[in-house]
A protein has these predicted regions:
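Long, low-complexity serine/threonine/glycine- and acidic-rich segments characteristic of extracellular
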Residues: 169, 184, 194-339, 372-373, ...
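Short, solvent-exposed beta-strand-terminating loops
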Residues: 84-100, 186, 254-267
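Histidine-centered catalytic micro-motifs
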Residues: 92, 143-150
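Surface-exposed, glycine-biased beta-strand/turn segments
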Residues: 9-86, 95-98, 112-122, 127-128, ...
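A solvent-exposed, charged loop/short amphipathic helix patch at secondary-structure junctions
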Residues: 103-114
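A structural signal for beta-strand and strand-to-loop patches characteristic of beta-rich domains
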Residues: 165-174, 334-350
Length: 400
């Protein structure tokens, strides 16, 4: 697996770090972190918990957009560069004096504090490293910092760390926090159950290994929870680059290095919402579900799902990278084990004895009744006054 071309790009000398150029800097947020409703765009640069750091133009260009808002990016500048990219500087406390005066005049003219302006080309032109504003804590910021982005000509967000800024040091590989295997259809099983299973992990340095052989059958999906750290910072940042190999063959890759704002809400199908809702952590699905239109995946024709066959052994290696090329790995073995199916005796249920859940095209029924198991019983469903008879695909006695 060779790192993407963007990683440690060779054009690092054409862009300057916007805070304290040529000095050590620290980040509180990185590209692609999983937030509740979106992926984090760009990077968040620490300013020592203070307002007032000079913000420098990352490359020569001119201001194309100015926004003043009490939410979101707060006071923000957008600068177009000769290569067609746009840099974004958000949560500013002040703009450069000439911009500040222009904004104030327009606010008075329009009798509004919140304003969005589009200056003429070269009306506010700056050279590389010239000060364009002062860092702040405006808008939806939760603490003083500079939010910084680089966007391409289509306004897609690029990962700024792919520009090789030497001001940020990172020799720490990603850290694994959790791993799970999920059955993906009604015929699939993990440890003979139609349930998502958390896998126990052992760690040696940054090499991780599953403590148990995973017994599974049918189509299953892998899910990973972890974070990345950078030198000198306690923040838990996101893991953007993940690769899955099965018996030496690449099944899945993700590299969150380019992001379209129009697809941000698809994060809700990138992470397993049921786990986030009940347990809190946001795992990466290492497979692509129906309806997911995000563009940063490479998968097999199974969309990253594994088809586990009875008695076959699958050696799996999962590689996690950060933009600086640091790597950690997880190794596990999945062995195919056909399910031991048994069905519930058909009985009449009292309303207070049953519950049910529907996920996709699967109906799960829960009952507190204790009854004998028989192989050929059926289930009668009353749907809108019509009785439909079906045979359950799976039965689990949780009292056994």
């Amino acid at each position: 697996f060779s790192l993407p071309l963007g990683v440690l790009a060779q054009n690092s000398d054409s862009y300057t770090f916007p805070i304290r150029p040529n000095k050590s800097n620290f980040l509180s947020g990185t590209m692609g972190e999983l937030r509740s409703s979106h992926f984090h765009a760009g990077i968040d640069i620490k300013t020592g918990g203070q307002i007032g750091e000079p913000v420098h133009a990352t490359k020569r260009g001119y201001i194309t957009r100015i926004k003043v808002s009490t939410y979101g990016y707060g006071n923000a500048l957008y600068m177009l560069h000769p290569d067609g990219n746009t840099s974004v500087y958000a949560h500013l406390n002040e703009f450069a004096p000439e911009i500040q005066e222009y904004v104030r005049d327009e606010q008075y003219k329009k009798q509004t504090y919140e304003i969005e302006l589009f200056p003429q080309p070269y009306q506010f032109a700056f050279k590389t490293q010239e000060v364009i504003g002062i860092s702040g804590n405006t808008g939806g910021s939760l603490g003083p910092h500079l939010h910084f982005e680089i966007r391409d000509a289509q306004q897609r967000v690029l990962n700024p760390l792919h520009y090789g800024f030497k001001e940020v040091r990172d020799n720490i590989p990603p850290i694994l926090q959790g791993f799970a295997v999920r059955p993906m259809d009604i015929e699939a099983r993990v440890f003979n159950k139609y349930e998502r299973a958390d896998i126990r992990i052992d760690r040696t340095a940054f090499d991780y290994k599953a403590m148990d052989t995973v017994k599974a059958f049918g189509h299953v999906g892998l899910e990973l929870w972890g974070h990345d750290k950078l030198n000198g910072s306690a923040n838990k940042n996101g893991i953007s680059i993940i690769e899955v190999e099965v018996n030496g063959e690449t099944y899945y890759k993700q590299d969150i290095d380019v992001m379209s704002f129009g697809l941000q809400r698809h994060i809700l199908v990138h992470y397993p919402y049921d786990v986030k809702r009940t347990e809190g952590p946001k795992y990466h699905k290492l497979y692509v579900e129906d309806g997911n239109k995000l563009k940063f995946y490479e998968t097999t024709n199974q969309n990253g799902l594994l088809k586990i066959e009875n008695n076959k052994v699958y050696e799996i290696e999962i590689k996690m990278y950060d933009p600086y090329g640091n790597k950690s790995t997880l190794d596990l073995i999945i062995k195919g084990e056909a399910p031991k199916q048994f069905l519930q005796e058909s009985i009449d249920f009292e309303l207070d004895q049953i519950d049910y859940r529907i996920k996709k095209d699967i109906l799960k029924i829960y009952t507190s009744n204790n009854c004998e198991k028989e192989e050929e019983e059926e289930l009668n469903l009353n749907i809108g006054g019509t009785v439909k008879t079906i045979k359950p695909s799976y039965f689990l006695d949780e009292t056994a």
